[in-house]
Each structure stands twice: as C-alpha cells, then as structure tokens.
C-alpha cells in the first residue's frame, strides 16, 4: 500500500540528520502554535495564502528565499567545516554519503529555491508597477506558480528525514543518476522537487511574458520601457524556451529509472552525453535567467542614486538582447573535456568570449552613468559597486575558462567553484539585495535601516572574498571539487581561511536579520509618506507606499522613457482626478490546493505509491478543469474607496511640498 516507504526510511542511525530534522519539526510546531494562539490562521489564509496580488506574492517569494537561504548556508558551513577537518589529518564528522547529499542539496537549494525566488519575487513586485498595469496577465497562475515552488522546496526538505537526497551533484549526471548506480530514492526526490518547481517557473515565464507584451500602459512602446522591464522580458523569453527542456530531460531520466528505458544509460543505445548536452542547454540560459533581472536592478539603482539619466539606454537594451540570444549557443563550454573535437570546442569557446562583450557594455554604461553624477552612497549603491568589482573578477575567470586548453586543466577544480560563486553571489545575490533595499518602501511603506544595511554589505563583501579567493589558488594547486576525505594537508591553510570567510558571510546574514527587525521596530520613524523616497524616475514611484491594491487609479499615458521624472520637473505629477470603479481579481485557494496535491503526487512518485500518485494527479486535473470554467473571478473596488486612498496620498505629497 505504501510502495517502498517503510520505517527504515527514517535515518535514526544518523544523529546529525535526526537532530536537524527534529529541530525543523519543532520550529514548524512552534510557528503553528503561535499562529493558532494569536488567531491568525484566518488572516493568513484570506490575506496571504490565497492572494493573487502580485505585490504580496513577491513578499512570499522573498520569505521562501530567505528560509531556504538559511538551509543552504548551513549546508555550506557543514561542507567547509568537514573539509577543514579532513585536510588536517582527520576523517571529519560527515560520512561520505551524507556529505554527497549535502553538496547536492546545497546547489539545488541555492539555484532553485533561493536565487530563483529572489529574482521572480523582484519581477513580481516591479514589472506591473513599471509598465502601468494593475496586475499580471494571469493572477491565478501567479499564485499557483508560487505554491508549486513551495511544494518543490517542501519535497526537497522531506528528503532530509524520510529517505535520502541525491548523491550525484546538483545536475545529477548519468550514469551515476541511473537506477543501477543510485538505486535509492535520492535521485527521485531530486527529479520531482525540480519537476514541480520547474513547472511553476515555466508558468511564471508565460505569465510575465504576456504581461509585458500585452499590458503596458498606453504610449509605452518597447523603447520607452524601463531597463528592468526589458531585462524581465528577456528573462522570461529564456524561461519559456529553456525550462521545457529541463522538464523533458527530467522526464526522460524518470523513464530510465522507473520503466527501464535507455535514453541515458551506457548500454542498449543509451547516451549519457546526450543528458549532459540537454541539461546544459537549459543550464546555461538559467545563469542568465538569474543574472539579467539583476542587471535591470543595477540600471535602476545607478540612475536613481547618481541623479542622472541612464547612460546609453539603447545600447543597454541591445546588449540585453544580445546576451539573450548568445546564451543559447555557449552551453558546451561546461564540458570541453567531453571530447567533441577541436572545432566544436573552438566554436563554443569563441561564443563564450563574445558574450562577455555585451556584458562589458553594460558595466561601462553603469560607470558612465555614475561619472560626474551626484552619487548618493545608499546601501543599494554599495551592493552595486560590490557587484561591479566581484562580477568583473568572475567574468574574467569565466573568459579564462572559455579557452579549451585552460579548461582541460581547471575543469572540475575549485577554480571552477570560485568562478561560479563569483558570478552567482557577486551578481545575482548582491543584485537582489540591492533591489530589496531599493524597492522595500514600495512594499511596506517604510525604509530599511541604513546602518545595519551597510554593516551587512561589508560583512558580505569581505566574507565573500575571504571565502572564495582562496579557492582560485586551491584550484591551481590541483584540488578538485566535492572532496570530503583524505584531503592533502597542504590545502588545510587555505581551506581554513575559506571557512573563516563563510563565518563572516554568516555574520552578514545576521546583520540583515537585525536590519529587518530594527526597521520594523522603527517603522514609524522611517515612513515613506510620499511614495517616492529616492526621487525615482520610473512609474512605480508615482504610487503611494505601500502601493494600493489596484496599483493605479487611472492607467497612466506614457510620453517618454522617464515620464514620471519629467512630470515631477513640471511639478504636476499628483492632482485630483475623476475616478471610476476598478475590477480586480478575487483571491482563490485553488493554487495552494493544487500545489498540495502536486506535492502528494511527487512524494508518492518517489516512493512508488501508485494509488496515491493516480489519485493526486486526478485531483490536480479536475481542479484545473474546475478553474477553467469558473467565471466568478473578479470583485469591484468602489469609487469611494479609491478616492479615499488617492486623496490620502495626495495630501501626503502636498505636505511634503512635492506638488
């Protein structure tokens, strides 16, 4: 009845795992008890869990990302500590099979459940506001996409205490991921957590692509869109094209494991290298799915805090489009050692070098925007400058790795690990932190504490270079990635420095937690009463903070790129107008319902509980059919309510002397 699931699936003989899992359960019980005690379940259900408001969904994406960041960071600390101990002549505290699960989970968590939610959360907040829309094109899909990501994260977390996770690395190359070499449920957990969250991401891509193409304010042609919206458009094009490749690849691997197919096996016509090609045809665009939105963040931040028009708007747009196209013809640089031949390697090496050109164009545009500007060193600008330094180093090491002979030496070494983290942390994570500090008032109506924000930045930047610069040297010294036992003692000193860097990053995360706490505590002091605390240039700053549920009482008409900026110079951006009732989408619990049964389907597929798989899949299909015929999906915001909200905003702006 329960397939392969038995009590033996609980790893009671692994004290570290059991203590961790029991701690997670106790924390979950404490949170549930607190919500019950304060009678907040009804509030959470109606205001948050069932919401289709893109702004609230962006907040929930951020919460998911920070929860999973904590889990992923703990994994990183465990790995660093194990390597330090193992390089000092001891065996360490993590057995090899547990260490292998940790480094696999770390990669999956940080890419799929930290970086992606951060990026999608920012797009959820900013895109509709920047294009003058009241919501996304498909509000229900937005809610469903979020909860599918949550289901994927929960399924991955379940593997910690029920069964095991994959020991294959975050991309699960066959034949190691085939059932012959990984007969346990770890790879199945990996497949279904990625499959469920990947479907949610694909729906997000479709949703935002349609939103940007069809819901822009009147007069906003493509070359009047803000650069962040351009970056979001290209990002979602990449999502819509590349994520179906991931879904298909995982499906083929599932057929190999469950039904004895031979797509990626070493025999009966299978081809493991086909898997590697397919996974990286998704994987390298995924890098730019993460990076392009934060390029948009930096464009907005630099222009705002330099008090200047963005330098080279058109070249920035074309550079973004060039990166979007080139990202699909560089994937083979991840495996030059495959043996495809010198001509193939040369082609992909050259395209990899070429993609550095539009990236360089962007960096120079940001520098020229700052040049002779009245630069205000807000914490968002600090994250931006940190990015410029860190990402440039990551880019240079990437160009070095694009040379096939060099890659043959450095492939699978810690040099590669350092390069990858240079790009992802220095680019994506720093960019998301810049965006959070920048747009936080638009979500919550008050400004984040600057003192603790700057402390967080300095611990992060110093910790990052302390943690990852030694890895470049270790790579040159010949240390390969994913080692946990019998590490050469000559690596001990540099590994110890890297571990100190990880601790400094941990202090940076603690500073961010304190920043949020202090900001909430002092929110009445740091209120954003005007909706435009930074003297911004784009449409989102024309609304109150927090932005009203309908975003815009009257859809704006756009005349130029920096329309709001021009209106402010004319001193007439806010005035009393005639309003009409607005139709807005209703909240729905169907998204969380479908995602729960998707989670059940994934769990039952992992453990071969066939009856539960069929039942949960059937419930998902019936729910989607029910949603497709439901016509009661909207409610009306009255003119009286709109006037109340807008007049209050007008009064605040007039008091601030901005009329």
Curated annotation (Swiss-Prot):
The gene is cyoB. One of its GO terms (biological process) is aerobic respiration. A ubiquinone binds at residues 71, 75, 98. The chain crosses the membrane at residues 15-35, 59-79, 107-127, 146-166, 190-210, 226-246, 278-298, 310-330, 348-368, 381-401, 414-434, 457-477, 491-511, 581-601, 606-626. The cytochrome bo(3) ubiquinol oxidase complex is a heterooctamer of two A chains, two B chains, two C chains and two D chains. This is Cytochrome bo(3) ubiquinol oxidase subunit 1. Keywords: Cell membrane, Copper, Electron transport, Heme, Hydrogen ion transport, Ion transport, Iron, Membrane, Metal-binding, Respiratory chain, Translocase, Transmembrane, Transmembrane helix, Transport. Residues 36-58, 128-145, 211-225, 299-309, 369-380, 435-456, 512-580, 627-659 are cytoplasmic. CDD domains: Ubiquinol_Oxidase_I. Residues 1-14, 80-106, 167-189, 247-277, 331-347, 402-413, 478-490, 602-605 are extracellular. Belongs to the heme-copper respiratory oxidase family. There is a cross-link at residues 284-288 (1'-histidyl-3'-tyrosine (His-Tyr)). One of its GO terms (molecular function) is cytochrome-c oxidase activity. The lineage of its organism: Bacteria, Pseudomonadati, Pseudomonadota, Gammaproteobacteria, Enterobacterales. It is an enzyme of class 7 (translocase).
